[in-house]
Amino acid sequence: MDQSSSTLLINQRKSSSSPTRIPPKQKRKSTTTHKPIKVRYISNPMRVETCPSKFRELVQELTGQDAADLPPSPTTFTAVDLHRPCESEMNLEPLDGEVRGEYYSPLDEEVFNAPQMSAGLSGFFSSGFYNVNALGSIGSL
């Protein structure tokens, strides 16, 4: 073999063993659409009684995807509002054959402001004072 043929073979090997340049892949546009998130602010907290086994069901009923929309209501109550319960707040339940009229009053003789209350409660629960176990019962540490 002469010099030129051996050089040709080496050049062929280099060109065949060198990787071919692959153009970079184009990024696909994400076609996912973001569904709007429904945020529910509770300005009129109410007290409900339920057993631990029904608690999750109650929460989902009140705040879940199929929850009824609540009418807009003010976030501040004055002392005048507390003395007059409206008809929708009345709860007439028969108890052992008797009918009792009970109503929920947001706070007695005080002005209620939702942002101030929620800030205070978040600090209270983040302190670790209460412990919620996997069964959903709340117990103090």
From Swiss-Prot:
Chloroplast recorded as keyword: yes
Any one annotated GO CC term: nucleus
Main location: plastid
Region (Disordered): 1-36
A Pfam family the protein falls into: VQ
Keywords noted in UniProt: Chloroplast, Nucleus, Plastid, Transit peptide
Motif (VQ): 55-64
Polar residues compositional bias, start-end: 1-20
PANTHER family cross-referenced by the UniProt entry: SIGMA FACTOR BINDING PROTEIN 1, CHLOROPLASTIC (PTHR33624), SIGMA FACTOR BINDING PROTEIN 2, CHLOROPLASTIC (PTHR33624:SF15)
Name the record gives this protein: Sigma factor binding protein 2, chloroplastic
Record organism: Arabidopsis thaliana
Gene (name only): SIB2
